[in-house]
């Protein structure tokens, strides 16, 4: 899970409020998600954002070019430029995470993360999502992650609650019990 700095949260909150005032939340959310996906898949972009070897001016112009070519909204392009100008380019992913949380809360959607040892099918994801929606009494957006170290079973996080029904956790509990015996 991404950790967000207080600064990243402040930038995200400012963008969220501005986008909300302009009625542009969905567009900004879409742009932010697309840009975050780009960061996650491009080692060069991560290096640009994280490295102090690149000047702020280089970062600003590179981000402006990316925003232009990707067709991001002008507001989102300005946001990226502002973060780079203020030396916060390395906080963009944290700001995206915070923005995403604000957006979900505004829409009344709860987020859940499910981790399994192997990729889940669409039907499995849908079933878990519908079960969670019934439990929480509202909409749930499910994100799935693959973690082979779980061996089998499932880990489910909804808000601050974690249900760990993985084989790895069961083996860990058995090991603890056996050591105590």
UniProtKB/Swiss-Prot annotation:
PROSITE patterns: ATPASE_DELTA (PS00389). It holds the Pfam family OSCP. F(1)F(0) ATP synthase produces ATP from ADP in the presence of a proton or sodium gradient. F-type ATPases consist of two structural domains, F(1) containing the extramembraneous catalytic core and F(0) containing the membrane proton channel, linked together by a central stalk and a peripheral stalk. During catalysis, ATP synthesis in the catalytic domain of F(1) is coupled via a rotary mechanism of the central stalk subunits to proton translocation. This protein is part of the stalk that links CF(0) to CF(1). It either transmits conformational changes from CF(0) to CF(1) or is implicated in proton conduction. Keywords: ATP synthesis, Cell inner membrane, Cell membrane, CF(1), Hydrogen ion transport, Ion transport, Membrane, Transport. It comes from Hyphomonas neptunium (strain ATCC 15444). One of its GO terms (cellular component) is plasma membrane. One of its GO terms (molecular function) is proton-transporting ATP synthase activity, rotational mechanism. Belongs to the ATPase delta chain family. InterPro entries: ATP_synth_OSCP/delta_N_sf, ATPase_OSCP/d_CS, ATPase_OSCP/dsu. Its main location: membrane. The keyword Transit peptide does not apply. SUPFAM superfamilies: N-terminal domain of the delta subunit of the F1F0-ATP synthase. The gene is atpH. The lineage of its organism: Bacteria, Pseudomonadati, Pseudomonadota, Alphaproteobacteria, Hyphomonadales. This is ATP synthase subunit delta. Gene3D superfamilies: N-terminal domain of the delta subunit of the F1F0-ATP synthase (1.10.520.20).
């Amino acid at each position: 899970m991404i950790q967000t700095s207080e600064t990243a949260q402040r930038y995200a909150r400012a963008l969220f409020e501005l986008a909300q005032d302009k009625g542009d939340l969905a567009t900004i959310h879409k742009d932010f998600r697309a840009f975050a996906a780009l960061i996650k898949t491009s080692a060069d972009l991560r290096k640009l954002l994280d490295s102090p070897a690149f000047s702020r001016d280089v970062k600003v112009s590179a981000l402006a070019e990316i925003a232009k070519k990707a067709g991001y909204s002008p507001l989102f392009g300005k946001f990226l430029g502002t973060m780079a100008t203020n030396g916060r380019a390395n906080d963009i992913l944290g700001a995206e995470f915070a923005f995403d949380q604000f957006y979900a809360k505004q829409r009344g959607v709860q987020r859940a993360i499910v981790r399994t040892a192997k990729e889940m099918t669409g039907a499995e994801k849908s079933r878990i999502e519908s079960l969670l929606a019934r439990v929480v009494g509202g909409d749930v957006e499910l994100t799935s992650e693959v973690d082979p170290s779980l061996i089998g079973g499932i880990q489910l996080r909804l808000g601050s609650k974690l249900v760990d029904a993985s084989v790895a956790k069961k083996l860990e509990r058995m090991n603890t019990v056996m050591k105590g015996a």
